[in-house]
């Protein structure tokens, strides 16, 4: 009887793991976030799962999000360079292609003031001990309205070109940015609003971990630009990733798209 019960429990455990959603916990406390050095930073006003949103105003605000586990280790190092060697808290498959997406709503604004997403960041430590960062940024200002996608590293062997892309008119009003990482060739590619832009960077060593963070702010907005919606959502689970990627691509938890 005990064996039957044990087998039943194990069976249910297997079923639950199959349906477990691939997520990331942005649960850092306000105290931790402000310990990074900016005491004016706040948590995002609205957080639902991995979606962060706020409404603009004529005041100046800055919001940020990290995971508690990652930030705790960064702060414990007591070193301004800690992010160059602190491993991410999401372990990655080290072969094949993995992908994740950002679903972003940016407001239509006049030519006064700024709204920034800088950055929506994914980064980690490569197997050679060096850091690599995949940066998605956005700025709306008096003379600019663009997304910036770039890869950076403290390893000089990194080769990166990057993209400067204007928001597009889409059917649902959201901008969709997909990052795919080829662990076989050590390359990173971009899909922007359904169009595969191809590989834009080559990093020198496999990446076996990631962390995610997000910062956004606005300032000097006109009264007509107040009360506009801004949102950034991380799409990590295969069921939420909607764009097309190279054959065999998986989500960051290793589940096929």
Indicate residue ranges for each PLM-predicted region.
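Secretory/extracellular carbohydrate-interaction modules
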Residues: 43-47, 53-152
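Positively charged n-region of N-terminal signal peptides that target proteins for export
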Residues: 1-4
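Short strand-turn-strand beta-turns centered on an Asx-Gly dipeptide
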Residues: 190-196
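Extracellular carbohydrate-recognition regions
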Residues: 20-56, 243-257
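Bacterial N-terminal signal peptides
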Residues: 7-14
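Flexible glycan-contacting loops in extracellular carbohydrate-active proteins
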Residues: 201-240
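Short, aromatic/His-centered strand-loop micro-motif at the edge of beta-sheets
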Residues: 22, 152-178
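Short tryptophan-centered beta-strand motifs in secreted/extracellular beta-sheet-rich domains
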Residues: 173-182, 188-190
